[in-house]
């Protein structure tokens, strides 16, 4: 009996540590051992019926223990499986919560980014009127310059107004031209003077010159401060009638033909 109980205890320990397939195999081996032990049991039952009944009760108790052990092993495995699945579910739930928090943080970040960009957009839109204002101020700066240019234009008109005076002098030349046309090819003795006072008196370089071809007798009057200072007369090939101004000094050029002295004071 002690040996049989020892074998059953070893079986229960093996069934608790083995897989689900091992208890079935071990139960088959125990049944085989039980059938083997039943032979001495029958032998014992021949000798002593009370021993056979005790052996039967012991075998039925061992079978009950084996079933209880296998059921406890299955329930323990089921409990471990449920515990593992519960931990897995909790781990998934825990891993799902950071993802949810990250998703929420991502939504919060995405929500904040447009709000951060909106002031910058408003700032740019606020700067745009400044650029437009600067562009608007630039034409206003250019407008006075245009007005200044328009103000300078009358001075140009004034210069153009002076031009008719030259035309008037050229008109005098034209009036003298018919006279020269009648005497083309004639020789004219022109009075020359290097320095003549305002009274028409030659003070230096007095003489005569002969006009040839297109030469004319020319008189130069020099004025300073609006007052006649001196005069110069001689023969010149090119004789334009005009007024020249330079640093407060004015020079009047008078051209004449068929006259020995152009000064008419």
UniProtKB/Swiss-Prot annotation:
Region (4 X 4 AA repeats of S-G-E-H): 85-168
Region (Disordered): 62-181
Region ranges (3 X 5 AA repeats of S-E-H-[GA]-S): 66-95
Compositional bias per record (Basic and acidic residues), positions renumbered to this chain: 69-110
Presence of the UniProt keyword Signal in the record: yes
Protein location: Cytoplasmic vesicle, Secretory vesicle, Acrosome
GO process terms (BP): spermatogenesis
Annotated Gene Ontology cellular component terms: acrosomal vesicle
Positions of the UniProt region annotated as 9 X 5 AA repeats of [SV]-G-E-Q-[PSA]: 110-174
Carbohydrate attachment residues: 258
Repeat positions for Sequence: 66-70, 71-75, 85-88, 91-95, 110-114, 115-119, 120-123, 125-129, 135-139, 140-144, 145-148, 150-154, 155-159, 160-164, 165-168, 170-174
Keywords: Cytoplasmic vesicle, Glycoprotein, Repeat, Signal
Record's compositionally biased regions (Polar residues): 152-163
Presence of keyword Calcium: no
Signal sequence, start to end: 1-21
Tissue expression from the record: Testis.
Name of the protein in its database record: Acrosomal protein SP-10
């Amino acid at each position: 009996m002690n040996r049989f109980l020892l074998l059953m205890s070893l079986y229960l320990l093996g069934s608790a540590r083995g897989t689900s397939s091992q208890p079935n195999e071990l139960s088959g081996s125990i049944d085989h051992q039980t059938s083997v032990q039943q032979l001495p049991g029958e032998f014992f039952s021949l000798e002593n019926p009370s021993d056979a009944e005790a052996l039967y009760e012991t075998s039925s108790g061992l079978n009950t223990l084996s079933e209880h052990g296998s059921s406890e092993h299955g329930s323990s495995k089921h409990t471990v499986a449920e515990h593992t699945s519960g931990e897995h579910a909790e781990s998934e739930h825990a891993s799902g919560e950071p993802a949810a928090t990250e998703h929420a943080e991502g939504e919060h970040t995405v929500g904040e980014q447009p709000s951060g960009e909106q002031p910058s957009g408003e700032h740019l839109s606020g700067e745009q009127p400044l650029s437009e204002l600067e562009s608007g101020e630039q034409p206003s700066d250019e407008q006075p310059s245009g007005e200044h240019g328009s103000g300078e234009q009358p001075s140009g008109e004034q210069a153009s107004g002076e031009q008719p005076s030259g035309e008037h002098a050229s008109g005098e030349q034209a009036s003298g031209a018919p006279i020269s046309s009648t005497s083309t090819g004639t020789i004219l003795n022109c009075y020359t003077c290097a320095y003549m006072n305002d009274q028409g008196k030659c003070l230096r370089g007095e003489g005569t010159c002969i006009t040839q071809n297109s030469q004319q007798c020319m008189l130069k009057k020099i004025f300073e401060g609006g007052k006649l200072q001196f005069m110069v007369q001689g023969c010149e090939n090119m004789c334009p009638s005009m007024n020249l101004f330079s640093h407060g000094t004015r020079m009047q050029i008078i051209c004449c033909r068929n006259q020995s002295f152009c000064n008419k004071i």
